[in-house]
A protein has these predicted regions:
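Acidic helix N-cap motif at the loop->helix transition within catalytic regions
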Residues: 21, 46-54
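Conserved donor NDP-sugar-binding/catalytic core segment of glycosyltransferases
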Residues: 94-133, 137-144
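Short, acidic, metal-binding catalytic loop of nucleotide-sugar glycosyltransferases
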Residues: 25-34
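A short, conserved alpha-helix in the catalytic core of glycosyltransferases
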Residues: 162-220
């Protein structure tokens, strides 16, 4: 690249002073020069903003008047930023010095690439992939998501097996590169999600708009693992169950949704019965509420106009089977055991 495109590194913060202290020095030390760093603050109650003013006066702060969550928080902040590329970065991500340049170079050489992510590795087990996105996300025919290097709670060691630039279905919101023009065309994240699945929905719509989503094997970052208690919390599972159904409803053509959505509701019911039989009553209750709230959402949005729907059967990065069957019944724990090229 003779002239580096204007790139905005944008962190969404809520009471994350500790992570800002840890990770901003790494971000500032990246070898990409034409960048500006922004922090969108979701009405933090700690002294994050005071810390930024004191220790990082060069960082641009955008303050939201309340905690808007991931989707609306980013939408509000990014609407105020002028750049050619947005890098959406979690505050708990440690970046490497050269994580930007390979991705931007790749996207500049192919204008059809709308969204990209680096490899996302574990911060504590640095040679293993991490839950948030591994080496790029896939989806199966029923809408279950998984990633190269991470199938449910099984993580692969990074031995170079995903060092290629590969088409994926979704890029992780923990570290996502997106053309600013595309983000505006897509009107940003869908705010009804609040959190979880907003990046999968965004990437699905990018495909429907004629763009591709790529994992760049020449770049990597390190993500702090979610606390195990939070990972299994009833509220988190509520959003995962509900938002997956909303995502499918929004993006599937009618011909596909008439089969897939009832099948998913039935499979979710099986999960709820499993939770009950094992005494996980709070998780079962929240999961059941997710199904009910999805149906309420679907009824309230029955006349909404969703354009450019795209079938799951038409993408190279869709597994044409059930990943839950491969994983739980056949015992396949690695991406290469499930997806054959």
């Amino acid at each position: 690249m003779s002239v580096q495109p204007r790139t905005a590194i944008v962190l969404l913060n809520f009471n994350g002073k500790e992570y800002l202290q840890q990770n901003l020095p790494f971000i500032k030390n990246t070898d990409y020069e034409n960048k500006k760093i922004y922090v969108i603050d979701n009405h933090s109650s700690d002294d994050s903003v005071m810390y930024l003013h004191s220790e990082h006066p060069d960082i641009i702060i955008i303050r939201n008047e309340k905690n808007l969550g991931y989707a609306a928080g980013y939408n509000m902040g990014l609407s105020q930023i002028d750049a050619e590329y947005f890098i959406l970065l979690n505050t708990d991500v440690e970046v490497t010095e050269n994580f930007i340049r390979p991705v931007i170079t790749l996207m500049e050489t192919d204008k059809n690439i709308g969204i990209c992510q680096p490899k996302i590795l574990s911060l504590s087990k640095r040679n293993y992939f991490e839950y948030a996105g591994g080496a790029g996300g896939w989806i199966d025919i029923a809408g279950y998501t998984f990633a190269r290097g991470r199938i449910f709670d099984s993580y692969e060691e990074d031995i170079g097996q995903f060092n290629d630039n590969s088409q994926i279905f979704w890029a992780s919101g923990a570290c996502m590169f997106i053309r600013a023009s595309l983000f505006r065309i897509l009107r940003g994240f869908y705010e009804d999600f609040y959190m979880y699945y907003e990046e999968v929905d965004l990437c699905w719509r990018a495909y429907a708009a004629g763009y591709t989503v790529i994992s760049c094997g020449d770049a990597e970052v390190y993500h702090k693992e979610t606390d195990q208690l939070l990972h299994q919390s009833p509220q988190r599972l509520y959003y995962l169950f509900r938002n997956n159904l909303i995502m499918l409803h929004r993006n599937l053509p009618l011909s596909s949704s008439l089969f897939i959505l009832p099948a998913r509701l039935l499979l979710n019911l099986v999960s709820i019965l499993y939770f009950i039989s094992n005494g996980y009553m709070k998780i079962a209750s929240k999961s059941a509420k997710a199904q009910i709230d999805y149906l309420g959402w679907a009824w309230s949005k029955k006349n909404m106009d969703i354009v450019n729907k795209k079938s799951l059967t038409n993408s190279k990065s869709v597994f044409k089977g059930l990943v839950i069957f491969q994983y739980y019944i056949l015992g396949k724990k690695k991406f290469s055991d499930i997806v054959k090229f």
